[in-house]
Structures are given as structure tokens and as C-alpha cells.
């Protein structure tokens, strides 16, 4: 992770962005789901299905953290914010893990706030509640042709499964650093 925050935010929820269903499982757009799955496994969480999302609660340093995978498809990810708000989770207490096509595969960066930069999942979150959330931007690369972006992010990774797993491990390590004192 190439950026450190002056003050570590109190994270109460980690949202992994992606699309539901086996068709999209191992795709660049689902890197958020894959990383949150790995966090859940590391901390022995158990996924529970709700109407529009899947969630698990984990404990890190005696702090409960809600892991969330919206099931509304990427472009409607922001619909989850109402449910999180009812649970007392504000945007400034959320870490959103998402694919970043403007980064080469493997680059990971932490960013507070900002625009969607063309990412429809972020656009939906911002439209439903603002941009105060923290982002873990995970580089998945970009196709040579701009017209191929939609296909690129929803097709299987071009990188090997091992390379993707190494990226997931690095992202989980970065999340652990963020969450531990």
C-alpha cells in the first residue's frame, strides 16, 4: 500500500465491491469480493445471506467489523448504504475494497474520499451517501482499447490464479495493517 493516513479511521464495515453469481466470481470487477472473502476466512467469519447483501461479523482487536458483499450488482452497490446506516455505520467508518483499472495489476493504494473516476460501483455509493468512505484501490490493469473495459472487468483474470492469490494476500495484509494499532 503506497499511502499512509495521518490518522487511522475507526473502520466498522468493510465493503467488497463485485457482482453476484458464479459467472463473475474470478473476474477483475470482483476483486473486492475476493479480498473480503479472504478477510472473512482469516478471522473465522461466517457469511449470512440477507435480502440485498451477504455479511459476516468478525472481531479484530476486540472490535467488531461487519464484512459486506452487496448482491445488487456493481452499478447499484450504493443501495446497501441504507441498511448500514440503520446499523449505525456511517460512510466515514467504511472501507470500500474495489478494482482500479487505472492502476497496473498488483498496485494497491489507500484513498480517502474523492470522485468515482468512472467506476460505476463507486458512483452508486457516492450518489446514495457521499464520498466520505475510505477506499482500498486494487490495481487490475486496463485493456488496450477503451471500448473493451466492460468486457475486461467482467471476464476472467488474464493473470494466473497464483498471481491473483498473491494480490489478494497483499491486500489482506494491507487491511490488517490499517485495522491494527
Language-model regions: role of each:
Residues 1-113, 123, 127-134, 143-150, ...:
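Nucleotide and nucleotide-moiety/phosphate-recognizing core
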Residues 118-121:
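Hydrophobic alpha-helical segments within soluble ligand-binding/sensing domains
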Amino acid at each position: 500500500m503506497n499511502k499512509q493516513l495521518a490518522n487511522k479511521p475507526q473502520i466498522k464495515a468493510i465493503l467488497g465491491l463485485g457482482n453476484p453469481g458464479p459467472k463473475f466470481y474470478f473476474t477483475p470487477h470482483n476483486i473486492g469480493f475476493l479480498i473480503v472473502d479472504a478477510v472473512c476466512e482469516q478471522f473465522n467469519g461466517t457469511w449470512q445471506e440477507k435480502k440485498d447483501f451477504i455479511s459476516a461479523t468478525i472481531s479484530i482487536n476486540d472490535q467488531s467489523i461487519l464484512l459486506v458483499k452487496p448482491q445488487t450488482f456493481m452499478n447499484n452497490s450504493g443501495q446497501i448504504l441504507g441498511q448500514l446506516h440503520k446499523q449505525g455505520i456511517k460512510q466515514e467508518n467504511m472501507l470500500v475494497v474495489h478494482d482500479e483499472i487505472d492502476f497496473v495489476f498488483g498496485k494497491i493504494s489507500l484513498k480517502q474520499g474523492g470522485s468515482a473516476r468512472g467506476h460505476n460501483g463507486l458512483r452508486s455509493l457516492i450518489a446514495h451517501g457521499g464520498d466520505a468512505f475510505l477506499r482500498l484501490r486494487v490495481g487490475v490493469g486496463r485493456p488496450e482499447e477503451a471500448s473493451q473495459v466492460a468486457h475486461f472487468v467482467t471476464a476472467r483474470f488474464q493473470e494466473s490464479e497464483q498471481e491473483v492469490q498473491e494480490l489478494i494476500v497483499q491486500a489482506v495484509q494491507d487491511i490488517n495493517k490499517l485495522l491494527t494499532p
